[in-house]
Amino acid sequence: VTRHGPSLELAEQVAGRVGLSFSASRKETVASAIDRVMVRRGIGEGRLLLDRLGSDEDLTEDVISAVTVAETHFFRGPEQFELIRQTILPELLRRRPEGSPLRIWSVGCATGEEPYSLAILCEEEGLLDGVRIDAADISRRALAAAKTGDYGEWALRNTGPRLRQRYFTSCEGRFRLNEQLRRQVDFAHLNLGTDALPAPEKRLSDFDLILCRNVLVYLEASAVRRIARQLLDCLSDGGWLLTAP
């Protein structure tokens, strides 16, 4: 495959190589993103890109960052956070064995806004000490950014002044999440396209609540069905899986 404009065939090959499977409506956008990576990297032919994927970690991360959607913000989808606060957490707490922490997993966490929002919510409800939050994403760069807990104004556009003042330190237009909350979230790399789930040896099983939002909408139907089944298998009895918006 030679690069002269976005190639849907190349996009499918590249996506498959990094363990992704995009819906038809998304493939043209993915092809354009891959083309931009090739131009920036000076890679003239698709076969050269394919040859380097996997062995060239930096290039692989470039491609993953280009073709995945990392736009998010704190308390995105506020109606679901209200559902968690008013319904899901109380129900889970009622049936939780004494001394056993609630386990929450944010899948496709991008730069960390979602799991940190969950940590803030649990702290606001006085529950954080009894909750364990894990978070995972395919992009190692996004995970590295998440671990810093450092955000701009746009990421906090749904976060009111009281929460900002209580949980963030501001400096020159940036907001740093308090260390206490950062320590409550464990981040790990995960490729939903290639990694086997459940994975008890990696503590990726028996979750009480799993959030996989704004991920499945970009994947083809067969991948969505497979991943949804795997995530359901990662739940504890009576656990919840949230997949929207």
Can you describe what each PLM-predicted range is?
Residues 225-237:
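A short glycine-rich, Lys/Arg-flanked "PGG" loop and its adjoining helix->strand segment in the class I
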Residues 85, 116-123, 232:
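A structural alpha-helix within SAM-dependent methyltransferase catalytic domains
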